[in-house]
Amino acid sequence: MLDLFKAIGLGLVVLLPLANPLTTVALFLGLAGNMSSAERNRQSLMASVYVFAIMMVAYYAGQLVMDTFGISIPGLRIAGGLIVAFIGFRMLFPQQKAIDSPEAKSKSEELEDEPSANIAFVPLAMPSTAGPGTIAMIISSASTVRQSSTFADWVLMVAPPLIFFLVAVILWGSLRSSGAIMRLVGKGGIEAISRLMGFLLVCMGVQFIINGILEIIKTYH
């Protein structure tokens, strides 16, 4: 049992800095400013479920999926970087509000009646939390621990789902507490956070792409 706790602790130490729930909370604050409390709670729960599912698939079938489709880790990083940068541009340069006219008001009311956009999978779960770095770490760790004799076989079977579940729970708790932050900073603060996070996401996306290109150069050099 002690080995199980050691494995879980080691997994959390490795994954939490990569998953970085606080970054996801800041992104959530920028994207969910106009959502109702119930919708924010629903998106928080869905994002946590998606993160758990992505990590489980990455651990048990990640390498198989990547080999089947011929996807490399550098390719995963570059693709994730493009997604992150695109999301960042949209946050940094949001669409301008329509001119105040009867037609614009009518259209605005129609849009308000429509369901809010689903942000749980993209970008909250992927690539913000379970991004290229997290997935790459899980896939590489999966192949490493299966060849290792540090832990018993039953620990290697039980620990990964528990680690991923705890990461998802930590993310869910962090996102649920974002409501208090929203009330504290107000709408203007949310817009400022959104622009700032947009800029940071563009930087992160570009860095993902650079890292992927550098890995390609090292591989084929």
From Swiss-Prot:
Q: Which UniProt keywords apply?
A: Cell inner membrane, Cell membrane, Membrane, Transmembrane, Transmembrane helix
Organism from which the protein derives = Escherichia coli O1:K1 / APEC
Q: How does it sit in the membrane?
A: Multi-pass membrane protein
- NCBIfam families linked to this entry: NAAT family transporter, PRK10995.1
Query: Which residues point to the Periplasmic side?
Result: 1-7, 66-68, 140-154, 218-221
User: Subcellular localization, per the record?
Assistant: Cell inner membrane
Q: Which InterPro entries match?
A: Multi_antbiot-R_MarC
A GO cellular component annotation in the UniProt record: plasma membrane
**Primary subcellular site in the record, as a coarse category:** membrane
User: Superkingdom, according to UniProt?
Assistant: Bacteria
Q: Which residues lie on this side of the membrane: Cytoplasmic?
A: 29-44, 90-118, 176-196
Q: Which residues cross the membrane?
A: 8-28, 45-65, 69-89, 119-139, 155-175, 197-217
To which protein family does this belong?
Belongs to the UPF0056 (MarC) family.
The gene is marC
Indicate what this protein is called per its UniProt record.
UPF0056 inner membrane protein MarC
